[in-house]
């Protein structure tokens, strides 16, 4: 049974919607799957603000129902809540995720090798733009970890498309992140690759960043160093880009305290309400 006391009173437990599977094509003809959440009281005559959601990993896959992993169970619940609050939400299973075959998982030039999965971000945005029920001036994006990376990429490279974003413990410079899973990595010894890795990072495009962002991070994160958000905030400050920060002291990557998940999602909703409505 559900631990009812852990469910926020505002969560629409009695009016969950069934998301729809959506398949769209990236510019290089790769098919991308997603789950589309329409508002609870959907009206075909209205135009809604819309959000893209990107999972972490990247070796993950979002589902058409609650997830078996707690991190993504929470994210699915948040997408349900956003739909209940009159947002159209598209959760994107971008390339390098699992469940669509080896070629999809080991996608050419993904991640630090060229960020080819960014094509899926743009394809998802174009799908939303093609819908008559979406307000093209109010498209945002959010995600955690690898999804935070793609959120930051969207804002850095295409603030002309994305009006706002929420970046939860996202990676912003591949040359920093690689050291987490390959401690011997030395960018100075691999200059060509290091240049490619940097150019596959949000920090490489921060000069183009215009749209507001909320940065959420625990300061004891061992997966994505807290310094990633600190360094991005400093770069945004120099660019006079509006940003907010929510920092959880002594919190790790996958938040240990349920109340911190709730607080982060409350802040996410509040930020989008102020910046996109």
Task: Label each PLM-derived region with a short phrase.
Residues 1-277:
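Serine-hydrolase catalytic core recognition
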């Amino acid at each position: 049974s559900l631990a009812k006391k852990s469910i926020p009173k505002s969560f629409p437990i009695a009016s969950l919607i069934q998301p729809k599977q959506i398949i769209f094509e990236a510019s290089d003809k790769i098919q991308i799957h997603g789950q589309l959440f329409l508002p609870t009281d959907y009206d075909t005559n209205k135009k809604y603000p819309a959000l893209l959601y990107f999972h972490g990993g990247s070796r993950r896959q979002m589902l058409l129902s609650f997830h078996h992993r707690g991190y993504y169970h929470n994210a699915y619940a948040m997408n349900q809540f956003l739909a209940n609050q009159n947002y159209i939400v598209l959760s994107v299973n971008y390339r390098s995720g699992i469940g669509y075959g080896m070629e999809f998982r080991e996608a050419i030039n993904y991640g630090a090798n060229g960020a080819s999965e960014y094509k899926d971000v743009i394809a998802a945005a174009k799908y939303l733009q093609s819908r008559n029920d979406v307000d093209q001036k109010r498209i945002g994006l959010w995600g955690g970890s690898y999804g935070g990376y793609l959120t930051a990429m969207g804002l850095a490279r295409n603030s002309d498309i994305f009006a706002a974003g929420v970046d939860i413990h996202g990676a912003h410079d591949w040359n920093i992140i690689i050291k987490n899973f390959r401690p011997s990595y030395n960018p100075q010894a691999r200059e060509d690759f290091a240049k490619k890795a940097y150019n596959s990072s949000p920090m490489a495009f921060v000069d183009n960043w215009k749209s507001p962002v909320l940065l959420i991070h625990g300061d004891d994160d061992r997966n994505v160093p807290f310094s990633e958000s600190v360094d991005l905030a400093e770069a945004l400050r120099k660019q006079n880009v509006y940003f907010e920060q929510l920092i959880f002291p002594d919190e790790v990557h996958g938040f240990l305290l349920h109340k911190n998940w709730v607080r982060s999602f409350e802040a996410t909703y509040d930020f989008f309400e102020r910046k996109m409505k």
